[in-house]
Amino acid sequence: AEKIKICLQKQVNSSFSLHNGFGGNLYATEEKRMFELVKPKAGASVLNQSTWIGFGDSRTDKSNSAFPRSADVSAKTADKFRSLSGGSLMLSMFGPPGKVDYLYQGCGKHKVFYEGVNWSPHAAINCYRKNWTDIKLNFQKNIYELASQSHCMSLVNALDKTIPLQATAGVAKNCNNSFLKNPALYTQEVNPSEEICGKEYLAFFTLPTQFGTYECKLHLVASCYFIYDSKEVYNKRGCDNYFQVIYDSYGKVVGGLDNRVSPYTGNSGDTPTMQCDMLQLKPGRYSVRSSPRFLLMPERSYCFDMKEKGLVTAVQSIWGKGRESDHAVDQAYLSTPGCMLIQKQKPYIGEADDHHGDQEMRELLSGLDYEARCISQSGWVNETSPFTEEYLLPPKFGRCPLAAKEESIPKIPDGLLIPTSGTDTTVTKPKSRIFGIDDLIIGLFFVAIVEAGIGGYLLGSRKESGGGVTKESAEKGFEKIGNDIQILRSSTNIAIEKLNDRISHDEQAIRDLTLEIENARSEALLGELGIIRALLVGNISIGLQESLWELASEITNRAGDLAVEVSPGCWVIDNNICDQSCQNFIFKFNETAPVPTIPPLDTKIDLQSDPFYWGSSLGLAITTPISLAALVISGIAICRTK
């Protein structure tokens, strides 16, 4: 009789690379990074399509006769905007004669403002003031600030009021022989003489707690008054000084000008200029007192419910060639914390005409058609990778990637995978379940700055019955990491709060601190990914070894008395009793695959974040996969020895 020895043998050559893991190592034909770097797309986007609203003009007005050529947004996005061609929030606030007057109102956690160009130097609105840019800047700034703290907002276009019986609605020659709708001008007579004295006016207006279905917790009110260069310009008879003052219900001054206590400008002009300050006032009854001859009466406001903090995106609104624009929207953005600005890099060139349908703006606003994982001043991201090449400029919201270098991202094995352990490690089934991917899927792995010793938490103890990290030791390691991270995170947050109090006046210091924190988080996350990578490698290696054990057991069962297992993964067979076809049945399974390979492991990593905590990531969870392809035992060959 001729006896031969047949063994399982790993086929590994120089094309394989070695990967070390916690509890087991393996060879692989390929490798890939756990994540690729993502690049933000320039422009605006939203985190949730169902929770945003836009406020616009002709460039977002679906009812415009030239739509869609006149628009800078898609038809889908235009449906989300409250728009009317020729309108703007400020035009509706003041109501200058001959201009569009639109009732702006709506609700959304994220508000996108693409309007403002219709009140610009090109509009040439006078009404006792030729340049309204500084008032527009203050108006837009207050709108953005209050919108960021509210879910709903609405124009209140008719305040309840009580005015003196002798007052008459006034007009002005330099206001197209009319006047603004807000404030309204009331006079003792049409075109009152500068020589009239008389008694002071006393009037009242009420800011409502509700306007239609809109709740009002705070109102934006324009407190307007005239600025005179001298007392003689105000009244040639000099019978009194000019004043126009607003009082709350307790008699406290909340706005206006009183030349009885404040000096005149001292300039040489003979025509007054109207100034309008923006006041944030609570609902209630207010009084207005003014010197004789006329009264400027608040007639409108913007109402805000102040129910929740939200996101504000301001889009630069400028004319095309031949029309003068201002930069009030851009400057208001700079003055409003948490506000994002979408800004053109090229002149506005329209498709429908010079001022409607700009291709660059369409590209910048195309992201409003989608939901992003992260929105920031640098742009928006919808890929799932936690890393980007460049630091994303704040403000940023959502699950925002952290800056990292490509070479610092850990690599995982791919392609054909072979465990490094010999077949002796596959003979005995492990007595206790090895810590595996299912355990990783269950938990949330908090990311923070871990000072030292993190690897030692996970090494655990090796078992003679198969090796690797036991479930119990790994769980204890993760529990220790979690506790340490929570303590460190809590201490860090307390320190940040204290530091913010000290440097709240220093915006650059805050930005520097934010950058340092994000860099630390990026380093910590990369460190945690390295640990997870090592766990995955070990887990895969163990899984492959178990498949080898199943293969060896199946061979022994099929052989019966025809083959004797003389060592782990090796059998002796009588060549005269078991011919080639017999051996093919036992060892090659008649060229079939009777033992299923281990299923692909799902190892997709998903960042969980708090959108209002520095805009960066707070947690890490393992979910469903980058498939680790080809986890097979096809690299196992049969080696014959005589």
Curated annotation (Swiss-Prot):
Enzyme Commission code(s) on record: 3.1.1.53
SUPFAM superfamilies membership: Influenza hemagglutinin (stalk), SGNH hydrolase, Viral protein domain
Disulfides per UniProt: 7-570, 107-152, 127-175, 197-239, 216-303, 224-276
Quaternary data: Homotrimer of disulfide-linked HEF1-HEF2.
Record region (Fusion domain-1): 2-27
Region (Esterase domain-1): 28-138
Cytoplasmic side: 639-642
Organism per entry: Influenza C virus (strain C/Yamagata/10/1981)
Domain of life (superkingdom): Viruses
Lineage: Viruses, Riboviria, Orthornavirae, Negarnaviricota, Polyploviricotina
Class of this enzyme: hydrolase
Catalyzed reactions: N-acetyl-9-O-acetylneuraminate + H2O = N-acetylneuraminate + acetate + H(+); N-acetyl-4-O-acetylneuraminate + H2O = N-acetylneuraminate + acetate + H(+)
Protein name: Hemagglutinin-esterase-fusion glycoprotein
Segments of this protein annotated with the region Fusion domain-2: 353-638
Topology term for the membrane: Single-pass type I membrane protein
A cellular component term, taken from the record's GO annotations: virion membrane
Keywords tagged on the record: Disulfide bond, Fusion of virus membrane with host endosomal membrane, Fusion of virus membrane with host membrane, Glycoprotein, Hemagglutinin, Host cell membrane, Host membrane, Host-virus interaction, Hydrolase, Membrane, Signal, Transmembrane, Transmembrane helix, Viral attachment to host cell, Viral envelope protein, Viral penetration into host cytoplasm, Virion, Virus entry into host cell
Signal sequence, start to end: 1
Active site: 58 (nucleophile), 353 (charge relay system), 356 (charge relay system)
UniProt similarity note: Belongs to the influenza type C/coronaviruses hemagglutinin-esterase family.
